[in-house]
């Protein structure tokens, strides 16, 4: 189960990188990725991940759906789904509902995150009861994390840390150690999958080591990365591929469908 937990975390963190824009406003869109076990061109398909980012007049609405059905060994089969619905009020607050189902066992978590007294106050409702926590004021909410990542890459930063809130991962904060690399990963889709063109003028290959920075279980931060990510991010805020290495499991995600969404026409602020 440790491998599956790592895989779920890897994909949740990876999804944070699948939207945003450094040179303009974040462009809303719906992106669908095919997940394959390993990086070989003939790697077995094990699922999909879909992220839908919608801009509203009040902020951002995020819908994320992950589905994995895989046989990791002849005797170990896994069925895992994760659904997230979240609303972010332009960095001021975040409200979400997440439902995960592992081999038929369902777990639902709801929560809100708000700035108070110089910190992020997290209120979570789990099947085990309320689970409040406090996160550093430097923690970025999902869309805010996207914006910060892209601004730093576009600005020429070679390496930098990023604290990001991942609502699916027990409502905790994660430290992303970002490095610009010489080449991206998962640039070549399998022969059976058509290549989807990403609207952009620039792109940045990167690698990210992920550790848990704000645990909610009282344990110290992780000493080693629990997930590493490799990919290429375009200035339109979209990735065409990503490799997530969770130790015992490596998953490659390839973009298979992309739809750009229109921004709403909102009344001017008073």
Regions from the PLM with identified roles:
Residues 24-26, 52-61, 87-92, 198-200, ...:
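A short, structured loop/turn motif at beta-sheet edges
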Residues 1-6:
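Positively charged n-region of N-terminal signal peptides that target proteins for export
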Residues 8-19:
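Bacterial N-terminal signal peptides
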Residues 39-41, 57, 70-72, 92, ...:
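Residues that cap or initiate secondary-structure elements
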């Amino acid at each position: 189960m440790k491998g599956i937990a790592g895989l779920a975390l890897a994909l949740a963190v990876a999804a944070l990188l699948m939207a945003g824009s450094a040179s303009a406003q974040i462009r809303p869109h719906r992106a669908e990725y095919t997940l394959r076990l390993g990086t070989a061109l003939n790697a077995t398909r094990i699922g999909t991940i879909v992220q839908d980012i919608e801009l509203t007049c009040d902020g951002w609405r995020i819908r994320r759906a992950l589905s994995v059905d895989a046989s990791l060994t002849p005797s170990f089969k896994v069925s895992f789904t994760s659904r997230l619905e979240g609303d972010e009020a332009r960095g001021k607050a975040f409200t979400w509902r997440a439902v995960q189902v592992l081999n038929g066992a369902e777990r639902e978590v709801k929560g809100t995150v708000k700035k108070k007294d110089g910190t992020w106050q997290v209120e979570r409702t789990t099947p085990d009861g309320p689970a409040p926590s406090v996160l550093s004021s430097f923690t970025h909410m999902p869309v805010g994390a996207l914006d910060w990542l892209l601004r730093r890459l576009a600005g020429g930063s070679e390496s930098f840390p990023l604290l990001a809130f991942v609502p699916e991962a027990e409502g905790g904060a994660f430290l992303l150690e970002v490095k610009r690399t010489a080449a991206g990963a998962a640039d070549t889709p399998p022969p059976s999958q058509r290549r989807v063109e990403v609207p952009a003028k620039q792109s940045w290959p990167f690698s990210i080591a992920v550790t848990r920075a704000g645990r909610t279980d009282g344990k110290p931060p992780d000493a080693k990365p629990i997930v590493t990510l490799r990919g290429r991010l375009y200035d339109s805020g979209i990735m065409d591929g990503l490799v997530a290495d969770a130790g015992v499991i490596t998953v490659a995600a390839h973009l298979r469908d992309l739809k750009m969404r229109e921004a709403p026409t909102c009344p001017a602020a008073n």
